[in-house]
Amino acid sequence: MKTDLLIFLALSLPAFTQTTVKDALAKHWKTSGEFTIAVANAMPADGYTFRPNPEEMNYGQLMAHIAGVNLNACSNASGLAKPALPPKIAEWSKDTQKVDVDKDTAVAFLRDSFDFCDKAVAAMTPERLDAVVGPPNRHLTGFEWLWAYFTHTAHHRGQAEVYLRVKGLKPPGYAF
């Protein structure tokens, strides 16, 4: 009897662990989305063309970049098809350094990208989290796609906070 129970627990543990990982990913992607949108909203509309130096993306391009990469990463991780790009974003994606993205478009695109990522994470199975997925030139598990691009979002959100401070604006407080 004890042996059967131990075998059952040993075989069940990976499933419990994966569920916990998935739940943590879902929680933190949601928080990251809300925080990133708050940072996006902190810049006034007329600041969306601001760039601290000529080599940097402007604020609107930076927000669109975060959202576009979210769609790619969450699609690769989950296998869900990416939603169609809004017309202004499709135009921007053809020339990311020359086409500006206004605040309303950028914030809506960010919101849509995080909504898509919420659905993608919810659709993940333990097998998909462990499987190598996505394009052949990127050997990442589903978990790695989500984690790598969670940190990508954090990196660029931090960059956006510097843009705000350079403009004399106070970014929203950290959320975790």
Which positions does each model-derived feature cover?
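Sec-dependent signal peptide recognition
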Residues: M1-F8
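N-terminal signal peptide c-region/cleavage motif recognized by signal peptidases
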Residues: S12-P14
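Short, contiguous alpha-helical
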Residues: A26, K30, E34-I37, G47-W92, ...
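Well-ordered alpha-helical scaffold segments within catalytic/enzyme domains
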Residues: F35, V39-A40, C74, F116, ...
